[in-house]
């Protein structure tokens, strides 16, 4: 859950 680089790692959810 990298909120700083959420576009880099493959996350199941996007915490914007």
From Swiss-Prot:
Function: Possesses antifungal activity against P.infestans but not F.graminearum.
Top-rank taxon, per record: Eukaryota
Keyword tags: Antibiotic, Antimicrobial, Fungicide
Additional detail: Antimicrobial activity is not affected by salt concentration.
Record bears the keyword Secreted: no
Native species: Malva parviflora
Annotated protein name in UniProt: Antifungal protein 2 small subunit
GO biological process: defense response to bacterium; defense response to fungus; killing of cells of another organism; xenobiotic metabolic process
Quaternary structure and partners: Heterodimer of a large and a small subunit.
